[in-house]
Each structure stands twice: as C-alpha cells, then as structure tokens.
Curated annotation (Swiss-Prot):
Signal sequence range: none
Enzyme Commission number(s): 3.6.5.-
Disulfide bonds: none
SMART domains xref list: EFG_C (SM00838), EFG_IV (SM00889)
All residue ranges annotated as the tr-type G domain in the record: 17-362
Gene expressing this chain: EEF2
Protein family membership: Belongs to the TRAFAC class translation factor GTPase superfamily. Classic translation factor GTPase family. EF-G/EF-2 subfamily.
PANTHER family per the UniProt record, alphabetical: ELONGATION FACTOR 2 (PTHR42908:SF35), TRANSLATION ELONGATION FACTOR-RELATED (PTHR42908)
Protein name: Elongation factor 2
Species assigned in the record: Gallus gallus
Amino acid sequence: MVNFTVDQIRAIMDKKANIRNMSVIAHVDHGKSTLTDSLVCKAGIIASARAGETRFTDTRKDEQERCITIKSTAISLFYELSENDLAFIKQSKDGSGFLINLIDSPGHVDFSSEVTAALRVTDGALVVVDCVSGVCVQTETVLRQAIAERIKPVLMMNKMDRALLELQLDPEELYQTFQRIVENVNVIISTYGEGESGPMGNIMIDPVLGTVGFGSGLHGWAFTLKQFAEMYVAKFAAKGDAQMNPTERAKKVEDMMKKLWGDRYFDPATGKFSKSATGPDGKKLPRTFCQLILDPIFKVFDAIMTFKKEEAAKLIEKLDIKLDSEDKDKEGKPLLKAVMRRWLPAGDALLQMITIHLPSPVTAQKYRCELLYEGPPDDEAAIGIKNCDPRGSLMMYISKMVPTSDKGRFYAFGRVFSGLVSTGLKVRIMGPNYTPGKKEDLYLKPIQRTILMMGRYVEPIEDVPCGNIVGLVGVDQFLVKTGTITTFEHAHNMRVMKFSVSPVVRVAVEAKNPADLPKLVEGLKRLAKSDPMVQCIIEESGEHIIAGAGELHLEICLKDLEEDHACIPIKKSDPVVSYRETVSEESNVMCLSKSPNKHNRLYMKARPFPDGLAEDIDKGEVSARQELKQRARYLAEKYEWDVTEARKIWCFGPDGTGPNILTDITKGVQYLNEIKDSVVAGFQWATKEGVLCEENMRGVRFDVHDVTLHADAIHRGGGQIIPTARRCLYACVLTAQPRLMEPIYLVEIQCPEQVVGGIYGVLNRKRGHVFEESQVAGTPMFVVKAYLPVNESFGFTADLRSNTGGQAFPQCVFDHWQILPGDPFDSASRPSQVVAETRKRKGLKEGIPALDNFLDKL
C-alpha cells in the first residue's frame, strides 16, 4: 500500500462509517511511538525494513535526540479487513477499506496540553501500558481526560518481551499482572466515566471482548484474544464447518474468546474446557490463557533464546510460520524478532482492534456533540455535528497550530465535524472569545489551501468532508491557538479545551541585544501560537514572562523561541513560581469604603471557601454558565451554603470563571442593580491582582452586606463605584487573615527497593512529604508517591538521580494549591519573604499596603 495517491485517500474520506480517528496515549516511555511504527509500517508509509527504529512520528530533531515525543503528530493509515473480520464490527460500515487517522501524542506530563489537543479531534484512544511497570500517574491523567471528552479506550499491554526475558515471570504470574492492569484501568474508567447507562454504553475494557492487546512494540508482535481464538476455532473445527459464513464464524470465535480469559481451565488430556481448577482425577488444571496462549509463546521464546535449533525449527513448522531465506540463518534475539513478527504481526492485531472496537465519526459524534458544541442542541450546527452530515454547514474545530517549514507561518490543525471544507471557501473564523451576534474575535476570510498531514510530509488536497482531520493554510493570522471555523451564521463556538495541568512555572526573558526587542516580541507571539499550553505575558514593568507547566516544558519552549521563533540570543531569569492569595478566616470587622465623591458607601466582608469548592470550580462542576437553581442546590447540599445566598451569586472571578465568588446578601437596597456591573468590574480587577503582591486570588468569597447610594444617577457612575469596590475588597482581605498559597506537585518515583532511603532524604530537604509507597507486584520496583512544592522542584530530578545512583525516575504533575504556613505580616516568616521578593520583581512599593488606605471611617 505504498503508492497512496491523494485521490485514493479522498475517495475513502467520503465513507464516513469507515473512518477511525484515534490517538495513542500513555505514560512517558511506555513505547507509544515505537508501537505507532508497527501500525504505520503495516499501513504502508515507511518501508517495513526500517520499522521499530524510525519512530516515524517523532518529527522534530530534539525529539529524536531525547527519545521523547514532544508534539503530537498526525498520520493517515489505510487498512483492509477481510470478509471474516468485517463480521465482528457492531456499528454501521461501508466497504472493507478503513481510513485510520492516527495521532501519536506525548506521554511526558509537561506536554499533557498537547495530549488534550490531540484528544479533542479523535473519537477513540489506544492506551498503552508497560506491563512491567503497570498503570502510572500519567496514564491515569491522560485516561481521565479521554473519558471526560467521551473517547472510547482500548488497551495495549506493551513490552511483553521485557516481562519474559528480564523478569522471567512464569505464565500464571504474567496472567495475574495482566489481570491487575486491566482491573486498574477499569477502576479509572468507572470512576470518571458515566456508567453503562450513559450515552456511550459500557466502555470498560475486557480481553474477552477483544479490547485488550498484548505484545511488544520493539519486536513488532502483538495479539488480542481474537487471533488465538481464530487459530483454535480452525483447529477444533469439525470437517463440515469449513464452509461457515463469516457471521457464524464470528459467533464461534466470540464464544471461544470467552473461554480464553478469567477463571476458565483447560484439560489437555481430554481437550475439554472446564470452569473448575481441578480435573476429574484431582490434578490441578492449567488456566486456559496460560495453556493455550502464553504457553506457545513461552515455548518459542525458550527454544530460540536457549539456542535449541531442532526444537525451534519444529515449532516454527508447527505454527506454520514462513520465514524469509535471510531470516533462517539468524539466531537468538534477531531470530526471535523475525519469528514473532511473522506469527503475530503487531500491525494486524492492533489495526483489527482499532477498526472493530473504536467508533467511527458517525457513531461518536452522536454522543460527543453535547460536549463539543456550546450552542443550543437543536440548531443547524448541532444537528450537522450529530449526524456528521457532509451536506450540512461547515463546523470545524482547530485544536492547535503546527509550524511550517516557512518561518513564522502555521498550519491550523483540526477536525471537520460537519460539512465540507475546501480550498478557497469563504468562512467565519471564530476565536475562543467570540460570542454570537458580536463582531469581536471574528474574521470572514477565505481558506487558502487545505492539506493532509502525513507525519513528516504534507500533501495538498482539494476538499475534505466531515469526520476527517485536516490542516488549513492561511488561517493562522486570525487565531491564536484554537478556534472554530464555520459557514453557519448563527453558529456558537466549539467548547474550549480544559487542560489538566496549569502553567505555574514562569521565567522572564529578554533579548541579549536591546536592538532585537521587536524580534523577541514577534517570537513570543509565535511561541504562544505553537504550544497550546504556554502563556506569554507582558508585565506592567515591561518584563516579558513565559509561563509553562514545568521545567522541561519551559526548557523546550525557550529553545523553540531562541531557534525557531525569534532567532536571536536570549537571556532568561531563574524560574519563578506563581502564587495565589487567599484568606484563612472571616473578616473581623465590617469593611466600609466610600466613593471618591463621598456620596456612596459599600459594606462587605470576606471569608474562605469550604474545602473542595475551589477545585470544583476549576473542574467546571460549579460554573457561571450553570442553571441558577441547580447550582444553588449543589452548593447547599455539598457545602451547606444558605440556599437564598447561593442563588444570589453575582459572579466568579478573575476572568468570570475563576475560583472566587461575589455574593449579594443585602436586603432591600435601592438602585442595587444599577451598580452591579461596576462592583463586578471592581471584583474582577481585585481578584486578578490581589492586595499582597498582585497575584490572583483563590478560594475567597466576598459578601456585599449593605450599600448606600446617592439618589442621583450621575453621582454613582462606574468611575465612582469601581475603585471603591476594589478598595473595599482589599480591606476585606486584609482584615480576614490573608495567606499565600503555593502550587504543589504530585511526584511519582519508580525505583529499586535499596534506594528508597535516598529518596526520603531528598524529599525532606525540599519540604516534600511521602504519602504512599507500594511495591509493584511481581517486580523488585517500588513506587513512592509524594507531594513536593513546585518552588522546590527546580533541579529536583538531578538531585534525586545523584542521590540514588541514577536509579530513580520521577514524574511531576501539578496537583493542588496549598496554603504556605506563616503570616505574611510577620517579617520573619517565609510568606513575607515571598511577598517582598514578588513585589520587588514586579516593581511595586515595598511592604504590603496598610489597611488605612482601603478602610474608611463612617
């Protein structure tokens, strides 16, 4: 299938029931890119000889040097199912050729924003788990995101070669390892999923259904229970069964698959399956999975790796494996690779699992539409998305920008959800801040070219129908990172993606040569486009700040900035951590502020949130868009708020969505609604720049108790009320025991038992604490989980490696915000140092402003 012309691809694109959009997700170094190679090599875009070494989807030079995936890349594959295999597909189909759009995404947690962007445009996910180290923290994070986006998972147990050759597990232990991983994954799915009654039905993975693959990406072999069930159905078949039609055959194979997993046993003497572990004569029976599936694999491994030539030759003949002449002379690992590749090719097993079990756009968009589209569920756009209708109006989501070879220009990368996108089509380009009916963040422009993304290559194509993934040229000037492209006039936006990590580490950058400043600014603009997560901010003091998810993320952003985007030498400051400001108890006095003309008074108090509410707002469980009464009920039940107060939430802040709340608990105040907008504006301003050191506030609830206003409207305009509201809010915070919050990482460290002591030493020096330690069953590895302040995490990896002889591998994920102990007003405490440093860096007056500046006397 090498001669893939664009016309051939275009023809399959119309068969939307035969398209699969899927991403490959996993923990770092569990072998995603290597597995992707087997798929690409099977579907024919790399020469098969080079598969396994090419890592085709790692397109950047630094990715190949560091052996990690940094950006997600897209490739289209084509796979044909045989008549027999088509019978397994439970959804609608259209012919036997399948177009698979595969996105390989990074596993490293600092790039999880790339993963989010990849998930948005796909409907299914291949979750790769290293069967030696099991389900890790990043697997869980990514899987949780996938389920939140309603993406159906299938599982692949990778690195079986390690389990056999390094750990020398016996079949029963290996079965238990697999069983445990399947259980762990299902626990995550059932915790975050919607259950069987949800719109997707049951999405738990189960080897019996064929949604779990086993194998080794590096050696290029893999199987699901389906492959073995087919072998045994053929073997046990009676003579008359040879003429079975595909549907009957599929039914037989499915019955066989049920017998190959779980507590089912096989009696080799009689050739019968049984449900009890002991045979009729009382001897222990082997488990079917071990006897019928693992045993042949173990035999092949054993014969070849211990150089038993005759036995190996016999096995190869018995399993009916045809080797090339050049492979026959090999021995040891190379021969093992060749044999296993021939017998259980990874490409076939995985591509069959993908085509049979992952949903097509037709199936998936029915239940994903309500999550994807912000507008009413019955307008033209929503119906087009639900039905995946190529004749509907165009709705397309751009999930990220991909840099082109031409410096400074980007392809917009995204997926068509309804309609048809074509070269030269005039479209509405809507940024994330667009609201229907307004002009801002909206551009009417033609699309210059539509292109196909092929890993390292780009192919121009005339037009692309819905259900497909595509790149656009000429849209990049109008969008920053993401956006919606449509031809329907009253369309709403596609929902903005939620990132699982937040940018908490920031560095200031400046050009070494001041004359290069314009280039730096231009470079920052491009950097903000090319990475979905990074934030580029210009401080009021004129500093240029880059905020990222962690050290590695920032390092790569800075490298990109220096080499690709700005192309100038750059000086950078030490990394700085963002803090949040909060309060720890209720204001001890009622705070009053008067407006500049002394005619209006505001009375307010502040108090801290109950535990968990700020996190609920971050997750979107409680939000400004919710229906009023429903939100009030939730707050009353879960957090014991007063229902009438909960109904009178004026707004959330900063930015209208943040984790602070302004409630109105006044009784019978005249003209209150006229100043509502002004007070809200003051609140947004105050929560964005807190009183301690102008950082965002978090977890503060402000109550408006009473307002006295001037009767004449001209004396209570915005100019009078906004600064007053801000002063009053600051006074509330200062009287309510203000505190600083710092971000905390969850660190997961894998290491051998003997170096655990060294880890504790490093963590204690860095204010970290261990909250869980467990042994990975069946291996000598320990997993230590700890909380570590982000502030202390710089150089943590290097420190850890030097203290454990390089045997510990940490993974840091942003987990939560925690109050920094100590009072910022006490000059000896840690928070007061942080406040002083931050104020100095931002060029503010020294010392926290005194309460008298904000609090007025009656």
